[in-house]
């Protein structure tokens, strides 16, 4: 445990941010799974709707600093590619 007051404060802040990041990442993972399930079922309509929700969540996470900008772009690109592969 830290002895310095500022270090103790940083520990509290880090715990708060870690919790927030976990919640956001969990939500993104859930939305990504919805897209992947729809793609696996070849359901174009559901996949497209799910993709929109997932993209919004991923972009918000990137703007909050949960994901790096390029990591978010890569996730969105891969999901879009999967949805577009449905004939």
Swiss-Prot record:
User: What lineage, starting at the top, does this entry show?
Assistant: Bacteria, Bacillati, Bacillota, Clostridia, Lachnospirales
Function statement: Binds directly to 16S ribosomal RNA.
Q: Which PANTHER family match?
A: 30S RIBOSOMAL PROTEIN S20 (PTHR33398), SMALL RIBOSOMAL SUBUNIT PROTEIN BS20C (PTHR33398:SF1)
Q: Encoded by which gene?
A: rpsT
Source organism superkingdom:
Bacteria
Q: Which Gene3D superfamilies match?
A: Ribosomal protein S20
Give a Gene Ontology cellular component term annotated to this protein. small ribosomal subunit
Q: Which GO terms describe its biological process?
A: translation
Q: What are the entry keywords?
A: Ribonucleoprotein, Ribosomal protein, RNA-binding, rRNA-binding
* A molecular function GO annotation: structural constituent of ribosome
What InterPro entries does the record tag this protein with?
A: Ribosomal_bS20, Ribosomal_bS20_sf
This chain belongs to which protein, by name?
Small ribosomal subunit protein bS20
* Family statement: Belongs to the bacterial ribosomal protein bS20 family.
């Amino acid at each position: 445990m830290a002895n310095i007051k500022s270090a103790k404060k940083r520990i509290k802040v880090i715990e708060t941010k870690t919790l927030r990041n976990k919640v956001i990442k969990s939500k993104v993972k859930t939305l990504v799974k919805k897209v992947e399930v729809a793609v696996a079922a070849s359901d174009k309509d559901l996949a497209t709707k799910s993709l929109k929700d997932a993209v919004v969540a991923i972009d918000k996470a990137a703007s909050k600093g949960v994901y790096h900008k390029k990591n978010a772009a890569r996730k969105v690109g891969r999901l879009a590619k999967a949805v577009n592969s449905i004939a």
